[in-house]
Amino acid sequence: MRTGLGYDLHRLVRGKKLMMGGVHIPFKKGEKAHSDGDVLLHAITDALLGACGMGDIGEFFPPSDKKWKDANSSELLSTVWERISEAGWKIQNIDCVIIIEEPKILPFREEIRKSIAGILKIEKEQIFIKAKTGEGIGIIGRGKAVAALASCLIFCRHTQE
């Protein structure tokens, strides 16, 4: 068994969509990023890559490569997970924290869990999501950014049989 930890942060700006776990969250601002800016999927991707010792999201999808401009983060995670699972890894669970001042994430939590489960082809009961605010402190607390943390526990299916 191995654990991985992922983190991502993006500024929030007007005129962009707010994407969270592959779900569009209606809001006046969205993530400013090279891809679609889905901080939650980016954090999960980094957690999985770290657990497998396969680097990080920037190595797989460098922002300097125009091919990844406005890329769908669901597709990025799916691509990475396909490679990891081909190497024999399975997910035990993924635990996430979204840090955002507004909007409230709770009304979207189950849809986000379903979306992530669909991307990774696992049960939504293996995915846990919590949301916190910045308590008015710092760039997140002022509503100018969003961040996400994700941890994962994976195991090699060859050692479980």
Curated annotation (Swiss-Prot):
The record marks H34, T133 as: Transition state stabilizer. Its cofactor is a divalent metal cation. GO terms for molecular function: 2-C-methyl-D-erythritol 2,4-cyclodiphosphate synthase activity; metal ion binding. Keywords: Isoprene biosynthesis, Lyase, Metal-binding. Its EC number is 4.6.1.12. It holds the Pfam family YgbB. Binds 1 divalent metal cation per subunit. It catalyses: 4-CDP-2-C-methyl-D-erythritol 2-phosphate = 2-C-methyl-D-erythritol 2,4-cyclic diphosphate + CMP. InterPro entries: MECDP_synthase (IPR003526), MECDP_synthase_CS (IPR020555), MECDP_synthase_sf (IPR036571). It comes from the Bacteria. 4-CDP-2-C-methyl-D-erythritol 2-phosphate binds at D8, L9, H10, H34, S35, D56, I57, G58, R142. One of its GO terms (biological process) is terpenoid biosynthetic process. A divalent metal cation binds at D8, H10, H42. Pathway: Isoprenoid biosynthesis; isopentenyl diphosphate biosynthesis via DXP pathway; isopentenyl diphosphate from 1-deoxy-D-xylulose 5-phosphate: step 4/6. Homotrimer. Involved in the biosynthesis of isopentenyl diphosphate (IPP) and dimethylallyl diphosphate (DMAPP), two major building blocks of isoprenoid compounds. Catalyzes the conversion of 4-diphosphocytidyl-2-C-methyl-D-erythritol 2-phosphate (CDP-ME2P) to 2-C-methyl-D-erythritol 2,4-cyclodiphosphate (ME-CPP) with a corresponding release of cytidine 5-monophosphate (CMP). Belongs to the IspF family. This is 2-C-methyl-D-erythritol 2,4-cyclodiphosphate synthase. The lineage of its organism: Bacteria, Pseudomonadati, Spirochaetota, Spirochaetia, Spirochaetales.
